[in-house]
Regions:
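N-terminal secretory signal peptides
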Residues: 1-8, 22
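Boundary at the C-terminal end of the N-terminal hydrophobic targeting segment
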Residues: 27-32
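Short acidic-aromatic low-complexity motifs
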Residues: 43-64
């Protein structure tokens, strides 16, 4: 049996664990502290980012990332890192997105987690239900990782 070595850095490990935690419902409890002003700002950035997708405006969407931003479309894919790779990855679905419906959002410092249903038209999927983990720094999404809960084929 052939094995392959895979390097997992601390951030990827934490993002994976947080994605699983969010997917299983470990969000803010009813008696949790109110989000800080920074956390509220970070949640708003992610909300605005998700709201931008149905516009199909590539530059508007890319403006949420720094030049060295990263996006991993699913837990089984490698992240697209840097402006060129982000552009190429986003172009694969941008024109098919009809809605990102945010079901829940919470934040801890620079990390924002949302549960959402992404809806598509003229695409292999009708909808995708999952969890997004976003790391926000200086008003930009530096890393975005998505974790699948369920999907519905077209």
């Amino acid at each position: 049996m052939e094995t392959t070595a895979r390097t997992i850095d601390r951030r990827m490990f934490l993002a994976s664990g947080l994605g699983v935690a969010a997917a299983t419902g470990l969000a803010r409890s009813a008696d949790a502290a109110e989000p800080s002003p920074m956390e509220k700002a970070n949640m708003q950035i992610v909300k605005d980012f998700c709201a931008a997708w149905p516009s199909h405006d590539l530059e508007k969407i890319l403006a949420f990332f720094p030049d060295n931003g990263a996006y991993r479309m699913t837990e089984t894919m490698e992240p697209a890192k840097g402006r060129e790779a982000l552009t190429a990855r986003i172009k694969t679905i941008i024109n098919n997105v009809s809605q990102f419906e945010i079901l829940d959002t919470w934040a801890r410092g620079p990390m924002v987690v949302n549960e959402r249903i992404d809806r598509f038209s003229n695409f292999q999927l009708k909808s995708w239900h999952g969890v997004g983990v976003f790391f926000v720094k200086d008003g930009k999404i530096v890393e975005w990782y998505d974790y699948t809960i369920a999907s519905e084929r077209a």
